[in-house]
């Protein structure tokens, strides 16, 4: 994770960085992805999620002026305790559909999709859609996997949203 398995050390580092910034020091910005596909290749960063996220967020395909591909180290303490699925077992009472690509990457989208589906036990109608031969980032904007997903999503919404 963001703490590199040393949460106390990470928090101490963040506190020291905040103190330095408060005293006029430079901000420390952590880049979460390589700057380009070329940089990723040159540095051997070819793991599926790293490469595909870079391909999406660092190219015209998905790059946006306010795109969140970096963060201030001094404000990263929130990442240490963040749990996207906190209370999912009790709060997710509405119908739930999780759509995931079966090509697994290091960032954990497949695992997270399986987890949220598994934890949404309070939902009376939960469905899992696994798209074979597609990755998490393929589902962002590639016609074929988006079409496959929408073929499941549209009827689900028509049934539950009306």
Outline where the language-model segments fall.
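Short beta-strand/loop motif that positions the catalytic acidic residue
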Residues: 91-92, 98-100
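Catalytic active-site module of serine/aspartate enzymes centered on a nucleophile-bearing elbow/loop
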Residues: 132-162
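Flexible loop/turn segments at secondary-structure boundaries
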Residues: 1-4, 105-108, 136-138
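Conserved alpha/beta-hydrolase "acid-adjacent" motif
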Residues: 80-83, 100, 104-114, 121
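Short, conserved loop/helix-junction motifs that constitute active-site signature segments
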Residues: 89-92, 119-123
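Active-site nucleophile elbow and catalytic-triad environment of alpha/beta-hydrolase enzymes
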Residues: 2-8, 70-88
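Catalytic histidine neighborhood in serine/cysteine hydrolases
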Residues: 121-137
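Alpha/beta-hydrolase-fold enzymes
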Residues: 1-59
């Amino acid at each position: 994770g963001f703490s590199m398995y040393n949460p106390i050390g990470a928090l101490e580092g963040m506190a020291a960085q905040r103190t330095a910034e408060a005293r006029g020091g430079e901000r420390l910005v952590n880049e979460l992805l390589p700057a380009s596909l070329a940089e990723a290749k040159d540095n051997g960063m070819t793991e599926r999620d790293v490469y595909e996220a870079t391909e999406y967020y660092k190219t015209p395909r998905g790059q946006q002026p306010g795109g969140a591909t970096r963060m201030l180290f001094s404000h990263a303490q929130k990442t240490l305790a963040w749990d996207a699925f906190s209370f999912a077992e009790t709060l997710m009472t509405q119908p739930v559909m999780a759509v995931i690509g079966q090509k697994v990457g290091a960032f954990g989208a497949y695992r997270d999709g399986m987890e949220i589906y598994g934890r949404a036990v309070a939902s009376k109608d939960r469905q899992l859609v696994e798209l074979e031969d597609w990755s998490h980032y393929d589902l962002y904007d590639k016609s074929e996997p988006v079409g496959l997903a929408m073929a499941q999503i549209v009827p689900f919404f028509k049934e539950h949203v009306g």
